[in-house]
Amino acid sequence: EKGFAEARIIKVLKQSPLAAEARCDHYWICSKLQTLSYEEQLKEKEKQVVDAFQRIGGFTDFTINGVRSAENKYNYRNKMEFTFSPHRWILESEPEGVDSSFALGLHIPGRYDKILDINTCHIQPDIGNKILGIAREVCLKNLDLKPYDPKTNIGFLRYLMLRFGVKTNQLMVNIVTAYDDINKLSPLIDTLLKEVPEITSMVNNVNTRKADVAFGEFENLIFGNSFIEEKIGNLKFEISANSFFQTNTYQGKVLYDEVLKIAGLNGDEIVYDLYCGTGSIALYL
C-alpha cells in the first residue's frame, strides 16, 4: 500500500531501549510485537486507534482514553484452532531433509496452504501445549491419521480445536475431520483421554466441504458434555464447540465492567445485543 512498507531484520547493530526478549520461538512469524516492551505495545495500540479516527474517519476533535493493560499477558486465550496439514512450512534455521509432509500448528500469514508446525504456544494455557504434543506424536505413529489437503481434497484430519474454561478448569477437545469415521480416530481419542484426565468434553465436528473452516455440518459427541462452562463475573456460560465467545476471559470482564460503568443503567432500560454470539455483554448488564 502506498505510504507503507514492511521490513525484515537482518542484523541488530544497536538494541533499542524499548526492546524486550520474545518468549515465543516463532515470534517473527506469529507475533513480532513480542520484541517490544508491553508498555510500548499499549502505546502503539493507542496510536492505531487515533490513526483510525483521524486518517480514516476524518475526525479532528476527539479524546482517546489510554489502553487498559492486561494482568495476564500469556496463557490467557480460552480458544485455539490448530490446523493439520501435509504442507509444513520449513524454517530457514532447520536442517535440510526435514519432513514437510506433516504439520500441526498455525497458518503462515498470507498463506492458506502452509502451516507452521508448533510445539508451544504461549498464549494458550500450558495444558494446551501438552495436548498439542500428544496429538502430533499419535498422528505421526498412525498412518491412517493423515492431514487433510485443501488443494486435493484428500486426507482426514483438519483441525484440533481447544476450548479452555479458565475460570472453571473445564477443557474441550474438538477434532475436526473431513469425513465421519470415529473408529479411525480411536488412537487419538484413547490416548488423549488416558493422558489428559483434565479433558471434560471431547467432540468430533465433521466438515465434508472444501471450505477451510473449523466447524462442521454435524457433530459427534465422544466424551463428557457437548459444551464447557466459563464464568465472567457472577454469570456462568455454556460454550459449545462452534459458539462465539470472548477469547480472553480476563480482559472480557475488564471490558464488560467498563461498559457497565459507562452505560449507567438503572434496570428499566431495554438492551439490544446485536451480533452477540452467546449474548454475554447484555446478560452482564
Report residues per predicted region.
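Accessory RNA-recognition modules of RNA-modification enzymes
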Residues: 1-285
